[in-house]
Amino acid sequence: MRTDTDTWDIQTSVGSTALAVAAGRALARHPANGAPIDPYAELFCRAAGGQWSDLVQGKQSDHALSSEDFGRSFANFQAARTAFFDNFFTTTSDTGVRQVVLLASGLDCRAYRLQWPAETEVYELDQPLVQQFKQETLDAHGAAPSAVRHPISVDLRQDWSTILQESGFDPSRPSAWLVEGLLFFLKSSAQDLLLETIDSLAAPGSHIAVEQRDTYPDIEFEMRRAAAADSAEPGGSPLADFLALIYNESRSEAATWLRGRGWAAERIALLDYMNTSGFELPAYSSVGWDTLRYTNMVTAAKR
């Protein structure tokens, strides 16, 4: 059961979803050349051990993420989502932005994977135990970031703007913000507070990218959650875990909210992006299709 003050490490609650995402990224491939979408993701799964290590080594053929339906569509989802946000940062870097903020960064390794312009600073905010696991794993493999990296241990439901600025962030300069896989883990009121804080810290010329999921009708949400729990393997199911952890509340639509505060915002359905960008689509009405059709990608620039 979620509470307003719950905390987690990498193996529990919301933290465990970071490992599921890492597993999806480890299994995901670029559609153009078959290269791994995130070469660091497998390191985290192996470090976590158990099902995650077995999964990326091909030792768990009965795992949900190994299935042809949900597992394949989840990996393709991770490939598409990762590429979308990678492209966002390429674009914002080209405009001269040199401050990047990753909210609920989890096991995101863009500070290592992407080629950043000189003097780019990347601020990564997440729970302390998640940050600890990430840092220890990267250090164990001698990984070196390609930007000036600032890992910040903080709960985003608390006052994180102060510690961000104390860590070197300058609100008078343009910045690029990423809100990936986060909003549905927040209550609607916490989402509004998060967006308000970003808006207050973002100078004109700043950019933001947001993953937004539409809210399920209440009856559909309860049916989906029950069905996912009933079909889960003994070790758990990423879909069942996800549905048990999110807040399925009516909430502000990010693009509309941002436009109301002077941002020029665009929104695209993830399935449309996948279709036009060469990513494999899940079969219509499959579990994968029904999961992804609620996901939208929002980008905005502050005037």
Swiss-Prot record:
Described function: Exhibits S-adenosyl-L-methionine-dependent methyltransferase activity.
Family per record: Belongs to the UPF0677 family.
Record key words, sorted: Methyltransferase, S-adenosyl-L-methionine, Transferase
Lineage: Bacteria, Bacillati, Actinomycetota, Actinomycetes, Mycobacteriales
EC number from the UniProt entry: 2.1.1.-
Pfam family, one: LCM
Classification via SUPFAM superfamilies: S-adenosyl-L-methionine-dependent methyltransferases
UniProt protein name: Putative S-adenosyl-L-methionine-dependent methyltransferase MAB_0213c
GO molecular function: methyltransferase activity
Organism: Mycobacteroides abscessus (strain ATCC 19977 / DSM 44196 / CCUG 20993 / CIP 104536 / JCM 13569 / NCTC 13031 / TMC 1543 / L948)
Keyword S-adenosyl-L-methionine: yes
Annotated InterPro entries: Ppm1/Ppm2/Tcmp (IPR007213), SAM-dependent_MTases_sf (IPR029063), SAM_mthyl_Trfase_ML2640-like (IPR011610)
Entry's Gene Ontology BP terms: methylation
Residues holding S-adenosyl-L-methionine: D126, D155, L156
Enzyme class: transferase
Covalent S-S links between cysteines: none
